Amino acid sequence: MEEIKCIFCEIESSQVVIEENGYQGKKCPQCGLIYVSPRPSFDEIVSLYGHDQAHISSASHISDSFQKRLYARHNLGIIRSVVKSGALLEIGAGAGYFLDEARKIGFYPFGLELNPAQADFIRSELKIPCEESPLSTTVFEGKKFDLVYHCDVIGHFFEPISDFRKMNAVMQDGSFLIFETGNLGDVDQHYFKYFQRFQYPDHLFSFSTDSLSKLLDRTGFEVLKIYRYAILPQLILNQLTAGIRQRFFKSARQQGSSANGGRAGKTAGGIQQSRMGLTLKMVIGPVWDYLNYLLRYKVGALLPKKGRPQSIIVIAQKRKTVG
């Protein structure tokens, strides 16, 4: 464990705004960056993914195809307004559904994913090149990319400035960096109660618009546009229904397991009930995912945003090398 300062302002903040799982999130009074301090070592953080101990398991990522593809198609609609094809690198590719959707519309996809099960799924099931390694200038034999993308990954970077410089190094001049993240550093603290968890310690940094601008400027990028979506209604809905959803989906999983494995002597009526539970989950799950999608990207685009929780999509371009 080590104490750190704001990576931009080099200020050692004493303002603790988040406490979770024995860790503290401190907020820089100048740029709004929220950072975990003291924090675990790099090897300890990597082990969370290598041993599948992250809050969202690899099995959940892989099974959540409908939601992942829905969100991917939305973001690809924005991406195609600035770049329509080319070599695409996704950092933190999860189960690879964004890459698969991008391939359908003309991109050549490549992924980086630390979780072994998900990386293997991308390679073996989706047939997409994927390296099970952190970002470096030697990934995919030093290939240069036309687009680098990541979603809800920036908070995991151990050294964001170093990692964004690596992104810059693997990109063609004038190519695009596009990513989705939160704006927690801009959010009034009384809204923090609507977050069910902050996923400490695997989320090490939470950015404000100011700190994101500093990060991009220092690492050779120019911000072209930021899309903003208010997520407070989505947070409230998920908080209010958390207990119900947990009980329902747990019951459906158990019923599905019983229907597939089955105990000896299980009645026909019991099997039918189990199958009905599994079918109900298969119907309600996508409806729930679509409702969350509408709240985030359609309703959220219209609602007030200042000081409130948002999901933001940043469009940035690599500055061209002079000479």
Task: Go through each PLM region and give its residues.
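Short N-terminal helix/helix-N-cap motif within the alpha/beta-hydrolase-1
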Residues: 158-162, 189
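Conserved N-terminal segment of class I S-adenosyl-L-methionine
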Residues: 1-151, 161-166, 228, 297, ...
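Short glycine-dipeptide loop
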Residues: 171-177
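Short, glycine-/aromatic-enriched active-site segment of Class I SAM-dependent methyltransferases
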Residues: 179-206, 210-217, 229-231, 239-241
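A SAM-dependent methyltransferase catalytic signature shared across enzymes that methylate proteins
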Residues: 7-14, 210-228, 290
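Short catalytic micro-motifs in class I SAM-dependent methyltransferases
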Residues: 151-158, 202
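A C-terminal cap/extension of S-adenosyl-L-methionine-dependent methyltransferases
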Residues: 4, 228-323
